[in-house]
């Protein structure tokens, strides 16, 4: 990446020892300033011919950030990523008492309060774990630090598949012995014990913030299913409350027990990953079908009371875990029944059909109907559609898709946003049905190298700066504009504003904080910025 400098006058050569010392000191200060301005270690860029670059990491080098500190009162920090190659680069500025520029004005409205944030993260699938563990210990450590440490983007959510999914290299459940209704042969295989669990522990040790785990099942054991297969059209045999449904509910408790024995405890479970998938003939990978009515009765009679009467009564239960296109209908069916509703903490949504389902008509309407049931984005990835290339190393647009989705979700009351695989190989796998997709980190095992994509940094513009407990507040625009913007107040009282410019035009703008004054800035074309300042 070439860095251009502004034109400048030549400085006269310093004379004598004092001059040399002054020049040396100035050089050191400039170097230090450059280090401060670009994080602890800058991106090592590489282009693969797409719209932007990846940052290359290996056993000896990886770009990193400084631990986050609040700027001095009356000043702000600005973190910038651009299509041209900047990656979360820090600069500082000062609030002004008066506004001097024209154009767009964004006014912080701290008294207009909305949802509190749970957090941001990704999924520790079998595929992700296999790729991460294939790296040398040094490179692996840097990858996990990039996601979870203060030097990285500080994820605080990890999704854990319950047994196999498409991003596994074999098909298995935790209870494959037929007719084992007491689940006496339930056990965690090597995928959990040797892959996922050690990596999750390593991530938790690195994190300065508490990390919340949530789990989702793809399929039950085949002997509990109507079609006797992990995939295709099939549901649980029988009806809610019977031994098939009760056994499946007990399976959740057994899973939580097994992970607790490894000292891992869960914040939440989802009732089923994409329950609509198992209603389709020929569905290619692990699934278990539920209609909304079936899920309603299942929650009310099986996992709801089973979890409530177990040692895991504090584990939250999330319904849906499927496309938001199914809202508000699914919520209306499930939550209309008080017996089901009392067990449901939240509604999990996936992003894959968002282009068919406007946020206002789905998320907005669901929040209007059920304001006390939280909305949570539980899965997203790019490259899954049949017309999309699986992996596009360095694609800026794919990062933009992430940040645009996160801002839209935040504006419509969603409390968290979860990416899919934490890491994949250059093909977008492994995946046993070859359902290859993209990931914010791509691992090239042959070179003991991993690539941090624009998606990684777009996510980081939220995850690093918006800790759990932050609350979205109002941000009023003086005129119609093409920027995506959102504002939040952190638990420490500081303010965060994220500005995404998806357009080809630079946009001059001013952010007004009624308590401090005016922050005058520019949102360059194809850029994302996070602004942070102290309000107390």
Curated annotation (Swiss-Prot):
Q: Where in the cell is it found?
A: Lysosome membrane
Q: How does it sit in the membrane?
A: Peripheral membrane protein
Q: Which UniProt keywords apply?
A: Cholesterol metabolism, Disulfide bond, Glycoprotein, Glycosidase, Glycosyltransferase, Hydrolase, Lipid metabolism, Lysosome, Membrane, Signal, Sphingolipid metabolism, Steroid metabolism, Sterol metabolism, Transferase
**PANTHER family per the UniProt record, alphabetical:** GLUCOSYLCERAMIDASE, LYSOSOMAL ACID GLUCOSYLCERAMIDASE
Which residues constitute the catalytic centre? 274, 379
- Protein name per UniProt: Lysosomal acid glucosylceramidase
| Cysteine-cysteine disulfides | 43-55, 57-62
Q: Which organism is it from?
A: Sus scrofa (Pig)
Q: Which SUPFAM superfamilies match?
A: (Trans)glycosidases, Glycosyl hydrolase domain
Its signal peptide is 1-39
Biological process annotations from GO: autophagy; cholesterol metabolic process; glucosylceramide catabolic process; lipid glycosylation; lysosome organization; regulation of TOR signaling
Q: How does it assemble?
A: Interacts with saposin-C. Interacts with SCARB2. Interacts with TCP1. Interacts with GRN; this interaction prevents aggregation of GBA1-SCARB2 complex via interaction with HSPA1A upon stress.
A single GO molecular function term of this UniProt record: galactosylceramidase activity
Q: What is its EC number?
A: 3.2.1.45, 2.4.1.-, 3.2.1.-, 3.2.1.46
Q: What is the lineage of its organism?
A: Eukaryota, Metazoa, Chordata, Craniata, Vertebrata
Q: Which Pfam families match?
A: Glyco_hydro_30, Glyco_hydro_30C
Q: Which GO terms describe its cellular component?
A: endoplasmic reticulum; Golgi apparatus; lysosomal membrane; lysosome; trans-Golgi network
Family recorded in the similarity comment: Belongs to the glycosyl hydrolase 30 family.
User: Quick one: which pathway?
Assistant: Steroid metabolism; cholesterol metabolism; Sphingolipid metabolism
**Per its UniProt record, what InterPro entries does this chain match?**
GH30_C (IPR033452), Glyco_hydro_30 (IPR001139), Glyco_hydro_30_TIM-barrel (IPR033453), Glycoside_hydrolase_SF (IPR017853)
Q: Which reaction does it catalyse?
A: a beta-D-glucosyl-(1<->1')-N-acylsphing-4-enine + H2O = an N-acylsphing-4-enine + D-glucose; a beta-D-galactosyl-(1<->1')-N-acylsphing-4-enine + H2O = an N-acylsphing-4-enine + D-galactose; cholesteryl 3-beta-D-glucoside + H2O = cholesterol + D-glucose; a beta-D-glucosyl-(1<->1')-N-acylsphing-4-enine + cholesterol = cholesteryl 3-beta-D-glucoside + an N-acylsphing-4-enine
Where in the sequence does glycosylation occur per the annotation? 58, 98, 185, 309, 501
Main function: Glucosylceramidase that catalyzes, within the lysosomal compartment, the hydrolysis of glucosylceramides/GlcCers (such as beta-D-glucosyl-(1<->1')-N-acylsphing-4-enine) into free ceramides (such as N-acylsphing-4-enine) and glucose. Plays a central role in the degradation of complex lipids and the turnover of cellular membranes. Through the production of ceramides, participates in the PKC-activated salvage pathway of ceramide formation. Catalyzes the glucosylation of cholesterol, through a transglucosylation reaction where glucose is transferred from GlcCer to cholesterol.
């Amino acid at each position: 990446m070439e860095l251009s400098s502004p034109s400048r006058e030549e400085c006269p050569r310093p004379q004598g020892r004092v001059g040399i010392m002054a020049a040396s000191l100035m050089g050191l200060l400039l170097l230090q300033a450059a280090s401060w301005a670009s994080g602890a270690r800058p991106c090592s860029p590489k282009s693969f011919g797409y719209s932007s670059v990846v940052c290359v990491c290996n056993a000896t080098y990886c770009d990193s950030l400084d631990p986050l500190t609040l700027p001095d009162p009356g000043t702000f920090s600005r973190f910038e990523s651009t299509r041209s190659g900047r990656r979360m680069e820090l600069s500082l500025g000062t609030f002004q008492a008066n506004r001097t520029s024209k154009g767009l004005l964004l006014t912080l409205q701290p008294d207009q309060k909305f949802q509190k944030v749970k957090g941001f993260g990704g999924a520790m699938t079998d595929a992700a774990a296999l790729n991460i563990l294939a790296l040398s210990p040094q490179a692996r450590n840097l990858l996990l630090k990039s996601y979870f440490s203060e030097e990285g983007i500080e994820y605080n959510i990890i999704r854990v598949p319950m047994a196999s999914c498409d991003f596994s290299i074999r098909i298995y459940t935790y209870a494959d012995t037929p007719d084992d209704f007491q689940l006496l042969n339930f056990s965690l295989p090597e995928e959990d014990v040797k892959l996922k669990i050690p990596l999750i522990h390593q991530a938790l040790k690195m994190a300065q913030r508490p990390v919340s785990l949530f789990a989702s099942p793809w399929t039950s054991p085949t002997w509990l299913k109507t079609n006797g297969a992990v995939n295709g059209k099939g549901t649980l045999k029988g009806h809610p409350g019977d031994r098939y449904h009760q056994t499946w509910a007990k399976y959740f408790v057994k899973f939580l027990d097994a992970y607790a024995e490894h000292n891992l405890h869960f914040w939440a479970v989802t009732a089923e990953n994409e329950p609509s998938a198992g209603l389709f003939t020929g569905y290619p990978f692990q699934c278990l079908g539920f209609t909304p009515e079936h899920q309603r009765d299942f929650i009310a009679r099986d996992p709801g009371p089973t979890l409530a009467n177990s040692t895991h009564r504090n584990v939250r239960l999330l319904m849906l875990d499927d496309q938001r296109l199914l809202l508000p209908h699914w919520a209306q069916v499930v939550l209309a029944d008080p017996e089901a509703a009392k067990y449901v903490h939240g509604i999990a949504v996936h992003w894959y059909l968002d282009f068919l389902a406007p946020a206002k008509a789905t998320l907005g309407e669901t929040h209007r109907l059920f304001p006390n049931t939280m909305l949570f984005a539980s899965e997203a990835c790019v490259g899954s559609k049949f017309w999309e290339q699986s992996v596009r190393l360095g694609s800026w647009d794919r990062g933009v898709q992430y940040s645009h989705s996160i801002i839209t979700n935040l504006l419509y009351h969603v409390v968290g946003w979860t990416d899919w695989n934490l890491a994949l190989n250059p093909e977008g796998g492994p995946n046993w049905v070859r359902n290859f997709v993209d990931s914010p980190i791509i691992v090239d095992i042959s070179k003991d190298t991993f690539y941090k994509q624009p998606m990684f940094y777009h996510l980081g513009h939220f995850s690093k700066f918006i800790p759990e407990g932050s609350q979205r507040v109002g941000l009023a625009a003086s005129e119609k504009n093409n920027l995506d913007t959102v504002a939040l107040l952190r638990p420490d009282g500081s303010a965060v504003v994220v500005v995404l410019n998806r357009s080809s035009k630079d946009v001059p703008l001013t952010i007004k904080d009624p308590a401090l004054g005016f922050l005058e800035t520019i949102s360059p074309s194809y850029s994302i910025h996070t602004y942070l300042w102290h309000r107390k």
